[in-house]
C-alpha cells in the first residue's frame, strides 16, 4: 500500500468520531502498547538526548509552559507500507522516538536513509523532503514530537546548532 502523505494513528486533533469502533479498539491497544514501551525505553532516550543534544534537552526541561511542543503523535508503520516523498508544513523540529523497531523499515531525509533504533533519538527539520518505506515483517512504532522552531530560536537553538550537536 502507498500512502501519499504521512499517516499517523492519532494526532492532536483526533476525536472519537474520527474512528470506527474497530479502529478505536486497535488505537487503544496501540496506545497502551506504546505507553508501556515508552516507559521501558525512556531512561535510554533521556540519556541519549542529554548526551547528543544538551542545549535542546536543557530547553525542553525548562519548558514549563509547554510552548515548545506543537504536536505529539504515535506513528505506526505496517509492513509493505510506503510513504511518498513530502515536506512538512508546520515549520518544526521533528523528533522520532522509536519504541518498536523493524530493521526493514527506514526513513530517508534529504537523501540520507536510516533505520529507527529503539532508544536512539532521530530528528530533522520537517520542511526537509522525507519519505519512508517498510519492507520488514512487523509493525514499527514511533512517537513523533514536533517542536516550534520559532520558540527554539528564541532560546538560541537553531536547526544548524541542532544538526551540529547531532553531527547530521
Role assignments for model-derived ranges:
Residues 1-64:
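Non-heme Fe(II)/2-oxoglutarate
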Residues 46, 161-163:
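Intrinsically disordered, low-complexity polar regions and short flexible loop motifs
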Residues 59-79:
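A short glycine-rich, His/Asp/Glu-containing loop-to-beta-strand
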Residues 76-78, 88-104:
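Short, conserved beta-strand element in jelly-roll/cupin
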Residues 93-98, 121-123, 137-155:
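A short hydrophobic beta-strand segment most commonly corresponding to one strand
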Residues 98-118:
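A short beta-strand-loop-beta hairpin characteristic of the jelly-roll/cupin
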Residues 115-129:
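Conserved metal-binding segment of the jelly-roll/cupin
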Residues 132-135:
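Asparagine-centered strand-capping/turn motif at beta-strand->loop junctions
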Amino acid at each position: 500500500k502507498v500512502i501519499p502523505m504521512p499517516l499517523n494513528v492519532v494526532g492532536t486533533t483526533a476525536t472519537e468520531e474520527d474512528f470506527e469502533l474497530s479502529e478505536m479498539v486497535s488505537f487503544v491497544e496501540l496506545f497502551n502498547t506504546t505507553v508501556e514501551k515508552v516507559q521501558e525505553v525512556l531512561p535510554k532516550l533521556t540519556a541519549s538526548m542529554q548526551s547528543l543534544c544538551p542545549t535542546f534537552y536543557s530547553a525542553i526541561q525548562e519548558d514549563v509552559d509547554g510552548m515548545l511542543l506543537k504536536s505529539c503523535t504515535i506513528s505506526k508503520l505496517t509492513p509493505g507500507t510506503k510513504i511518498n516523498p513530502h515536506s512538512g508544513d508546520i515549520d518544526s523540529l521533528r523528533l522520532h522516538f522509536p519504541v518498536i523497531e523493524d530493521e526493514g523499515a527506514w526513513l530517508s531525509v534529504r537523501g540520507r536513509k536510516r533505520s529507527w533504533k529503539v532508544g536512539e533519538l532521530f530528528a530533522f527539520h520537517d520542511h526537509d523532503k522525507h519519505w519512508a518505506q517498510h519492507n520488514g515483517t512487523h509493525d514499527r512504532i514511533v512517537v513523533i514530537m514536533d517542536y516550534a522552531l520559532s520558540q527554539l530560536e528564541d532560546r538560541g537553538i537553531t536547526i544548524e546548532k541542532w544538526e551540529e550537536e547531532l553531527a547530521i
